[in-house]
Amino acid sequence: MIKVAIVGGSGYIGGELIRLLAMHPEVEIVAVTSREYAGKKVHKVHPNLRGLNLRFTSDYNFDADVIFLAVPHGVSMKLINEFLGSAKIIDLSADFRVRKELYEKYYGKHERPELIEDFVYGLPEIHRKEIKKAELVANPGCNATAVILALYPFKDLTKEVLVDLKVSSSAGGRRENLPSIHPERSNVVRVYKPYHHRHEAEVLQETGVRAMFTVHSVDIVRGLLATIYFTFEGNEKDLLKRMLIYKDEPFIRLVVDKGGLQRYPDPKYVLGSNFVDLGLAYDEENSRVIVFSALDNLIKGGAGQAVQNMNIMFGLDETLGLGYYPLYPV
């Protein structure tokens, strides 16, 4: 069994890590840390996990094969020395995802820049071989995952794209703040970040394409939809062929048939799963390509992708513990 520790288990991503790993047939959870909730059973914070015999601890003195860092941005770089060399590490923060110059442009000063190059960017569909040999993996951001996977087949066709993102309330994490309380958050379609979103850095690093995000908060709890626009003179058939690079990927589904309830990707149809649904439309008259990407920000955009990376790092079937279909209806 793989002995697993989760550092920072009280947030939504931490809760999903506990849920997924508790059901994983090759995993034993040896520790879940939280300074605020140390000593309390995990279901006191994550009510859906009632019946799971785990308590939070503030003690980092554990014996683990892999450690998931599910702490806020800026915290992993402060904690990393506690764990380096003792276990494989999968970091779910932004601290080690992008090169030093990009980090400083989008986030500010990095406290451990010498470690950035030691981390593999944990997007399996692009970096599977590197992840397999890695000791340190930086889990991608949720928005970045959606956009990179949608854009990657077309990265040689354009140097610049516009990206419209519709994101859920859970994407903002669990910290209470006034805009996130129910009377303020309910029924909104709110411009959250009109430009210079931090996840643009990951897209630029991984595709070489400058992506200009405009992010809207919408009235859903989980899930996101990315709509990507660029111009290209061609035809829809050839564009669809490019997406076939994903035909053997276990967690990418191409939404190309236009019958039934789903004509294009919709986060409603991926909730609770590690799937990404990709689709495309081509406005031939205006030479405009529109690519769609939908995922669950807490699963493929977070905990699920981290478990997928763990599976690869330990030589397991990467779908292990993740091979279930989305919830429906929701």
Curated annotation (Swiss-Prot):
It catalyses: [amino-group carrier protein]-C-terminal-N-(1-carboxy-5-oxopentan-1-yl)-L-glutamine + phosphate + NADP(+) = [amino-group carrier protein]-C-terminal-N-(1-carboxy-5-phosphooxy-5-oxopentan-1-yl)-L-glutamine + NADPH + H(+); [amino-group carrier protein]-C-terminal-gamma-(L-glutamyl-5-semialdehyde)-L-glutamate + phosphate + NADP(+) = [amino-group carrier protein]-C-terminal-gamma-(5-phospho-L-glutamyl)-L-glutamate + NADPH + H(+). GO terms for molecular function: N-acetyl-gamma-aminoadipyl-phosphate reductase activity; N-acetyl-gamma-glutamyl-phosphate reductase activity; NAD binding; NADP+ binding. NADP(+) binds at S10, G11, Y12, I13, N297. Pathway: Amino-acid biosynthesis; L-lysine biosynthesis via AAA pathway; L-lysine from L-alpha-aminoadipate (Thermus route): step 3/5; Amino-acid biosynthesis; L-arginine biosynthesis. Pfam families: Semialdhyde_dh (PF01118), Semialdhyde_dhC_1 (PF22698). It comes from the Archaea. Keywords: Amino-acid biosynthesis, Arginine biosynthesis, Cytoplasm, Lysine biosynthesis, NADP, Oxidoreductase. CDD domains: AGPR_1_C_LysY, AGPR_1_N. GO terms for biological process: arginine biosynthetic process via ornithine; L-arginine biosynthetic process; lysine biosynthetic process via aminoadipic acid. It is an enzyme of class 1 (oxidoreductase). SMART domains: Semialdhyde_dh (SM00859). Its EC number is 1.2.1.103, 1.2.1.106. NCBIfam families: argC. Belongs to the NAGSA dehydrogenase family. Type 1 subfamily. LysY sub-subfamily. Involved in both the arginine and lysine biosynthetic pathways. This is Putative [LysW]-L-2-aminoadipate/[LysW]-L-glutamate phosphate reductase. It comes from Pyrococcus horikoshii (strain ATCC 700860 / DSM 12428 / JCM 9974 / NBRC 100139 / OT-3). The gene is lysY.
